[in-house]
Amino acid sequence: MCIRDRLIRLPKELVYRYGAVLFELGKKRTVAVLRELKLDNNTIDNTGRLVDMHGMEITEDKPLIRHQASSCGAAMYEMVLRFEYEFYMAADDRNKAMALKKQEALFKEILENGDCLTLKELAVTGNDLIEAGIHPGKEIGNILKSMLDDVLNTPEHNTKKYLFDNHLHI
């Protein structure tokens, strides 16, 4: 598949275009090239993330989808899904493209359900942990990450009571 075929299918935004041209370089080299071109940081960061996520596992497993989305943010994850879909369509790999459409539908379901994807959306905050007697520092971060991981796997666990009962061992 040639670059032209990829570019024809993709949206006009620069992030998609640069991603299509530079994805084979990997994230580190893509970011270096874009910095040399003196592009804005937003374009550089988003293109780097798009390239980094290229080739992600295609899945119908909601917990894995939540983990993938959590790793880059919901807005970026939507961009990645669109990029991957157009990439596979340009490569005439309809099976992967259709699987990505299913994955996108599941992701929309996740968003509609209001599932927690970030620490900010977690029912417990760092201040809650401090009030519970945990000393500020790495331990709070580790506990919050553990809680988020649990909630990404099982969204129903995103309640203060459940998270305190199952993650705080004071």
Task: Show where each model-derived region lies.
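C-terminal subdomains that position terminal phosphate/3'-OH groups for nucleotidyl transfer/ligation
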Residues: 4-170
